[in-house]
Amino acid sequence: MHTRLISLLVGCAIIAGCSSSSNAPRAVPTSPATNTNGTPPTAIVTARFDPAAGVIPFPNNLLLSGTTDLTLNIPVANPADFSNPQVALNALDGFSPIHPWSTSFSVGITTNGLLASTLNLNTVRVFQVSLTGPGGGVTGVVRELAFGVDFIAALSSVDATGRTLAIVPLRPLAQLTSYMAVLTTGITDVAGNNATPDTTYFLAKRTATLITAPAPTGGCTDPSVSTDPLLPRANACGLEPLRLLTNSHLVAAASRGIPRDDVIVSWVMTTQSISPVLAAVRSTVTPAATTLVPTGLTLQAANAALPPIADIFIGTIAMPYYLDAPTDAGQTPSIVLRTFWQARPGAYIPPFNAFGLSPTSTNLTFANPLPVRRSTQTIPVLLTVPNAASQRTRPAAGWPVVIYQHGITRNRSDALAIAATFASQGYAVIAIDLPLHGITDRANPFNIRNTPFFAAGARERTFDVDLVNN
């Protein structure tokens, strides 16, 4: 179960009064602050970073903190309420490879927002990075993403105040890959005031430990104490792991020429897996026999606008099904809209089976990629084969076959519309329906109810459930 409290961030709750702290043992006189253009600041512009209040750049690997199965761990009120999008996100093993990133700024009341022209290749940097492990610190930079080629940065179109920066991928990011964003002081508001770190990030940038005798992961061990008189022990203990993560960002950024003092905020995100689950399913699927019989109809009999150059066959195939079905014992029709693929509890593959992960988790991830088969469903198949009218000769090895995949909300019979074109070139066309799709018109001769296969247990993939009005 995902916890409400993110333990890594527990120390961030009451540090607002600690911003005067520094690495120096005592305060020393300094020159008046100026912006990089030489003007005195007229407002304080901070890159907002307050994890205790849930204010962090998104997506962010901090939301993996406390995970028990390598999925996201966004704090939610009810982990069982999958109508909450954040609960659904918590079943994923990473973040979207295409969705924009965002981070916010607190702009002074005398200004009108961030200056868009300062969001450029010098102030917004994105790197592909390697980590110590899932959600861990940065160990190195793999490559830098190109501004204007791989991504752009701009003011968010959904924030009229001009306080939100959006980083928009221009091409999909790689799956199961970590990326680090680094923003610098070159970002300004319209008055020329340079952006600065928020209090928590300022403390996390410190090079010196916040506690004496820290644990290897940054937590407190007795009798450790805070190294800063203005920072209570509990807060220092909670911030030390964050300091270690942040410093790993800054070391990596420095390796690419970004001075530590110029960084106003940084964060890392890891993209979700895309192919492991489908690859795991494919590895277990074996060829299945297809039963096909001629209908005695040609394409023209099905649609008068089509030439009669292919014969139509119908049939069935038995397929594994990974969702609950209304035909299962005790299930109601609405079950088709309320279930999703699940893994066998705790069935992690090596090396993750040695990580001490949750033995009860059923989330499908790169660590537990094989879904549980709920049933075997006998589903309809539609096939067209060139006939003599096509003036094509059947090859000795048989007709080459085109697999047709219909679009969302459509069905397998759409294959008939292109079957004539393929038949004229000597191709057979075969089609099945997407899950929860099928022919809903009871008068359609290809509806499985109108064939002998229905009596043998075959069903449309809609299970004859009205998925539109229910």
Where are these regions (language model features)?
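Residue-level signal for short segments within beta-strands and strand-turn junctions
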Residues: 126-130, 385, 405
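Accessory recognition modules or surfaces
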Residues: 150-164, 170-172, 190-206, 378-401, ...
